[in-house]
Amino acid sequence: MGACLGACSLLSCASCLCGSAPCILCSCCPASRNSTVSRLIFTFFLFLGVLVSIIMLSPGVESQLYKLPWVCEEGAGIPTVLQGHIDCGSLLGYRAVYRMCFATAAFFFFFTLLMLCVSSSRDPRAAIQNGFWFFKFLILVGLTVGAFYIPDGSFTNIWFYFGVVGSFLFILIQLVLLIDFAHSWNQRWLGKAEECDSRAWYAGLFFFTLLFYLLSIAAVALMFMYYTEPSGCHEGKVFISLNLTFCVCVSIAAVLPKVQDAQPNSGLLQASVITLYTMFVTWSALSSIPEQKCNPHLPTQLGNETVVAGPEGYETQWWDAPSIVGLIIFLLCTLFISLRSSDHRQVNSLMQTEECPPMLDATQQQQQVAACEGRAFDNEQDGVTYSYSFFHFCLVLASLHVMMTLTNWYKPGETRKMISTWTAVWVKICASWAGLLLYLWTLVAPLLLRNRDFS
């Protein structure tokens, strides 16, 4: 009898791994939407790849592996297996990050193509999107193993340019998410203020708006102090001054009477969030300048703690402050992509999500939740609540962005010091300008396209 019960339990677990609902994950949680759970699991796969990349890039890991005679074969070449030995030089360092992120990007790009034009959970492909997690994990592992057998050759050089484009686009997506977050925040607090007839909510909005602007001003002052010199660093001075001017312009545009008439919820809170994010991107760009006198984050030859002996003798610019902050923002934005449900029409249009996902009435929804307690329930029978394909494309871009972040935008073959290049500087600065234009468009679009509904 015990064996029968055990077999039944294993069959139940197998059905969860191979079926259309991630019930193992949700068995200890309240009933949740299938669409949300699926996005969270895909995001977990991405975070798993990021964790492996960080481990491979960590100082000391290679030296520890070299102590195991059955693991590593001395030498620096392409990833090969010789008599059961593995070349650790190809497994660790920036090349490992490139290959790991190639595997995750290829994994999500496959699902980007597979999930094109899925309109509801009745589509057979929706079952693949929301289930078969064990097989998906095996596919990801297989792609990862295969990626380490790609010969070096021109792979890393070509993949670097894919990373540049993908990171540029993901920076824009991060800004779109911030616009959405700030808009939702402003709208909710204004609604609370009207419901409760309390000025405390207005005071809260004023406090955070002022805080974000003060932080932005402090950032400008610190960047001028540490990333410029009176007689040099002209590029940094121009970048800081231009972005400060552009942020002032969009802040003024956000409170213009005509903009307020067209979008009553537009205000300085959103502008302050965008301004602070722009200052962060500017800071990140300045920290990528490959000139010692204009960039205090560059490693020096005098025992700077950021210098790490990487695989094959490369010196790694390891975990400076902009990289850490950028990685935190990346994690938060990726989670936000998985959990978000926007009420901003223009953001939904940009992010390929629906403004009002299909909903049941209150009684039907309570019955569905009660029936599905302890597992995910299908909330997309009448229509998907987000674009499956675009979600996976965002994760492709996220994989490329984290690849560039972890490797400090290092261009293979350019130098044996893994430091950023001018390419990184210009990509980040151009992304900040494009982001400001994108935010400005969300402000003026209702004025320019009067025949469209932006309410």
From Swiss-Prot:
PANTHER family: SERINE INCORPORATOR, SERINE INCORPORATOR 2. Pfam families: Serinc. This is Serine incorporator 2. It is a multi-pass membrane protein. It is found in: Cell membrane. The gene is SERINC2. InterPro entries: TDE1/TMS. GO terms for molecular function: acetyltransferase activator activity; phospholipid scramblase activity. Belongs to the TDE1 family. One of its GO terms (biological process) is plasma membrane phospholipid scrambling. Its main location: membrane. It comes from Homo sapiens (Human). It comes from the Eukaryota. The chain crosses the membrane at residues 5-27, 40-57, 96-118, 131-150, 160-182, 202-224, 239-256, 268-290, 317-339, 385-407, 422-444. Keywords: Cell membrane, Membrane, Transmembrane, Transmembrane helix.
